[in-house]
């Protein structure tokens, strides 16, 4: 895990999406963060030890979805499906489908499995699934402020977690979508889809994949106006836990929490949320094949040396 000392930090991103404004300052106590997203290998150990069954593996009930036809009450999850030809980008249902039998053990559906994917990030995890793993591991999910602080790596004013150029000196720094979205990812960055963890350079804290690959759950409820609330105070908010309730005006009846980091499906053609200060959101019972998580735990006294082994790293003081 990476350790951070308590410090003041910038959150938000100008010139992208309204919910990332205004840019504001927060104060975050020191904490430890997993160096990578939780992998299939790690999640499998948890599932075997506890017998835990994820939401995507459970058959929905009529009580949960009283208006749904019985034939639609089938376990599964949401899977990205490339469009056969260029399509307007105003309706994501053109490239997403509900796949029966898709879950973390079968990322693309019943015919897929985890063979050779042990080091890939676990996906198709809903918020409660991620929380269950974190509790078992003696950790928790990061707050949105903690995630952005860690992603910035002790640096302020950057567009990306690594700097201000998307491809410095022509180098790919994260797993994002290359090619014509949503038709074909040409894999110019080395991966035509999801990748194993830690395939790109870590940030200055020794943390991997805080941009791209898979979105990551944060503990905060989502509200598009939350940053406005924080900015009204005259001093930096200390360890902001997020708003007390969820509200998304686009889907006001759904309870959503924050996603961060973007994914292998993010592209400048459609979604640029691999930028370090941008925000995502997701309904709490829903997973997909581009959504995972990592964990944190309290910690102080970071030292200025790197100590990376397995899924841990020591992060220098800012």
Q: What kind of feature is each model-predicted range?
A:
Residues 2-10, 15-16, 53, 59-276, ...:
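Functional-site microenvironments in short loops/helix caps that host divalent-cation chemistry
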């Amino acid at each position: 895990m990476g350790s951070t000392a308590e410090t003041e930090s910038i959150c938000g991103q100008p010139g992208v999406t309204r919910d990332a404004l205004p840019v504001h300052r927060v104060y975050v106590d020191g904490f430890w963060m997993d160096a990578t997203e939780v992998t299939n290998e790690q999640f499998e150990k948890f599932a075997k030890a506890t017998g835990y069954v994820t939401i995507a593996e459970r058959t929905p009930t009529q009580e949960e979805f009283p208006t749904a036809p019985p034939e639609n009450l089938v376990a599964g999850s949401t899977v990205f499906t490339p469009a056969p030809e260029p399509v307007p980008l105003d309706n994501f249902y053109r490239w997403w489908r509900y796949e029966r039998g898709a879950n973390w053990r079968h990322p693309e559906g019943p015919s897929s499995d985890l063979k050779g994917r042990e080091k890939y990030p676990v996906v198709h995890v809903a918020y409660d699934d991620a929380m269950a793993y974190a509790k078992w591991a003696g950790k928790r999910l990061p707050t949105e402020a903690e995630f952005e602080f860690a992603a910035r790596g002790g640096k302020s004013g950057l567009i990306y977690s690594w700097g201000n150029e998307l491809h410095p000196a022509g180098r790919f720094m994260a797993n994002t979508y290359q090619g014509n979205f949503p038709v074909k990812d040409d894999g110019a960055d080395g991966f035509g889809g999801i990748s194993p963890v830690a395939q790109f350079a870590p940030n200055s804290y020794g943390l991997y994949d805080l941009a791209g690959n898979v979105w990551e759950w944060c503990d905060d409820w989502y509200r598009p106006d939350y940053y406005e609330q924080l900015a009204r105070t005259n001093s930096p908010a200390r360890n902001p836990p997020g708003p007390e309730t969820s509200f998304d005006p686009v889907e006001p009846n759904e309870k959503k929490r924050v996603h961060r980091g973007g994914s292998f499906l993010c592209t400048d053609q459609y979604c640029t949320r691999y930028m370090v200060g941008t925000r995502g959101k997701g309904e709490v019972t829903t997973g997909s094949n581009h959504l995972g998580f990592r964990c944190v735990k309290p910690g102080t006294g970071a030292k200025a040396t790197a100590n990376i082994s397995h899924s841990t790293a020591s992060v220098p003081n800012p």
